[in-house]
Amino acid sequence: MASLSRAPQQWATFARVWYLLDGKMQPPGKLAALASVRLQGLHKPVYHQLSDCGDHVVIMNTRHIAFSGNKWEQKVYSSHTGYPGGFKQVTAAQLHRKDPVAIVKLAIYGMLPKNLHRRTLMQRLHLFPDEDIPEDILKNLTEELPQPRKVPRRLDEYTQEEIEAFPRVWSPPEDYRL
């Protein structure tokens, strides 16, 4: 009878969990690092390279990702068709305008292990450019992952009371003119 009581525990351990991750104002590399751990199942104590125990990851707002510095124009994605003269290069800004999901997808694809399980793991990744997620995926969601980076508030999001209560580092003298 002991094996019957352990069966539900084993199914709960290997069950697939659906995680939601918001990509708004987040760097693609940080999203990829967080998602690849969940897709592979590295966060589970029963993880093994040959066991398929990864979870589903749903990432929304991929249209609103953020790069630091001038990476929108400096980062180049390249591909080759295999034919002479088939080498193509496109900047991150051009690729993002064409397909707002592609940058996050390529970042996660690059973070996954380079073996035969890679495409199977990518099938458990669900990317959406905005907050519109289909109803059949929404009902499967079980947990929301915290964003890897804190999103800063814009200046127009502060109230006048918060601005006045903010500590002043320097106060100008009476005869100072702007």
Curated annotation (Swiss-Prot):
Chief localization: mitochondrion
Native organism is Bos taurus (Bovine)
Sorted alphabetically, which NCBIfam families does this protein's record hold?
A: rplM_bact (TIGR01066)
A GO cellular component annotated for this chain's UniProt record is:
ribosome
Oligomeric and partner information: Component of the mitochondrial ribosome large subunit (39S) which comprises a 16S rRNA and about 50 distinct proteins. Interacts with OXA1L.
Tell me which Pfam families the record gives: Ribosomal_L13 (PF00572)
What protein does this entry describe? Large ribosomal subunit protein uL13m
- Location in or out of the cell: Mitochondrion
Family under the similarity heading? Belongs to the universal ribosomal protein uL13 family.
* UniProt entry keywords in alphabetical sequence: Mitochondrion, Ribonucleoprotein, Ribosomal protein
Q: What gene makes this protein? A: MRPL13
GO terms of molecular function: mRNA binding; structural constituent of ribosome
- Gene Ontology BP terms: negative regulation of translation; translation
Which residue windows are coiled coil? none
